[in-house]
Amino acid sequence: MNFSTIEESVLKEKKKFNNFLSGFLKNSRFLIILLTAAAITAVSISVWIKSPEYQVLYNHLSNEDRGSIINELNEMKIPYQFTDSDGPILVPKDKVYEIRLRLAENNLPRGGSIGFELLDKEKFGISQYNEQINYHRALEGELARTIKKINSVKNARIHIAFSKSSLFLQDKKKSSASIILELQPGRNLNTGQINAIMHLISSSISDLPVENITIVDQSGKLLNQTSVEYDQVNDSQFKYTEEIETRYRNRIKNILEPLVGIGNIYAQVTAQIDFNAQEKTQEKYSPNSDHKNQSIRSHQIIIHNEIEKSNIQEETPIPLSNSNNHVYFNNNIKNSKNLKNNYIPVDSKINRDNTVNYELNHSVSHTKMNIGEIKRLSAAVIVNFSKDKNGKFVPLSTQKIKNIEHLIREAIGYSKARGDSVHLVNASFAKYDQKIPVHINHINTFRKSNFLYNFAPWFCSFALLFLLLKKYICPFSKNNTFQNTIPVQEKKSIDTRNIIEKNTFQVDLQNNTNTDKLIHKICNISNQNPRTIALIIRQWMSDKI
């Protein structure tokens, strides 16, 4: 191989580069441009290094808060940056917390709403009407701030119509509230969050029922559905009904599968649930008919006595005494034929009123019906034919069907008064010849206990990783090992020219005078045999030294 030709070509390329560089430096125009660009770059780098690092002070501010904060920053002579009307406000990084504390002294940011700090600025001599208006504004602002703490809510406004006090209950009206929410981009509120907002507002304001709250988003969509249809059809009621039906269906399967076998029974249960909230107050009065246990509430006796004297023509009798409503006279009176036992009877009237008031049995009961009470159950069950001694499928006997139906009734708590119904059908399944695995639990036990089943994914992963390492990492390690062994070969004084001649490639440099082709071939040789090129360069360096 002719190495002198290679050296000459390399020297020619160096000369060409030197000539180009010298020509470029001689041209003053290019030199001025180069120096100007270098100066501009140096100044830009110095300014960039000396400029303070900015950090976000506040983000997602309303226009009112943004203007107030910018005015405060101008008064404090603090540099700031912001991109657009909705972008963050940037301040120097080392002053972020100091600026936040100084702005907090002025109640900034307010979140686009005024809270109870409005009451701190009331003037002396303000009227009661204005004071009430300020309180309503402050309450609306505080509730708006509270709602904005929810992650999906960007901004909120609340309008409350407070009820006026009245002496008459029939003239008193309930309060109402309207809420408009501006949601974060790509965010939505679920039903639970909407209900939470409604109950939060309802519990913060007196005489404000949940039904009088309306929530609307920024696109004008009504978020809370208060219609009767929505109350009857919601996710929680569907889930509760499905849970009840699944529970009764599992009861039927669990009690019948030991008798007919797994897979030989299909059951469906339909439940009618009463989701109406009802309260009932009942008062009962019954007479106290038990004479032994009668309790007297009051007893009143009134006696009225009237006495009329008889007409006596002769001497006036001298009354001796008056006892037991009888008048006794002297025995010397004439015409004593009508006298008996020494007294003269007179006319008398006695009126006696006896009033007894007894206690009545009085009972008051207040009953609150549970929501979700079962109104009616209906069960439909299909049982497969059973095998006889010959292996043929035959229908079940009448007695066995009755027993199965009785078990179904007991399993679901059948109530005739409630109107429950059970329908049992004994029929041959369409795929009765398909073998149904009876011992399914054995398969799960095998999966848990089998070593290969548990560690097969890990084994495959490690095997794949090993193949990748062997294919891509090992060749690099072999090249490094060869490079480490080159000094040993030099110590053994191996002639590099002989090593080059042993290689299988040959380059015809004499026939290729074109420099581009020569460089192209040298590049190909270096890509195919980097070891040979390394040895050539080392040989050149050793020769020059």
Curated annotation (Swiss-Prot):
Cellular localisation: Cell membrane; Bacterial flagellum basal body
InterPro entries cross-referenced by the UniProt entry: AMP-bd_C_sf, Flag_M-ring_C, FlgMring_FliF, FliF_N_dom, YscJ/FliF
Segments passing through the bilayer: 30-50, 449-469
GO cellular component, one term: plasma membrane
The keyword Transmembrane belongs to this UniProt entry's keyword annotation: yes
Topological category with respect to the lipid bilayer: Multi-pass membrane protein
Subunit structure: The basal body constitutes a major portion of the flagellar organelle and consists of four rings (L,P,S, and M) mounted on a central rod. The M ring is integral to the inner membrane of the cell and may be connected to the flagellar rod via the S ring. The S (supramembrane ring) lies just distal to the M ring. The L and P rings lie in the outer membrane and the periplasmic space, respectively.
Protein family: Belongs to the FliF family.
Protein name stated in the entry: Flagellar M-ring protein
Species annotation: Buchnera aphidicola subsp. Acyrthosiphon pisum (strain APS) (Acyrthosiphon pisum symbiotic bacterium)
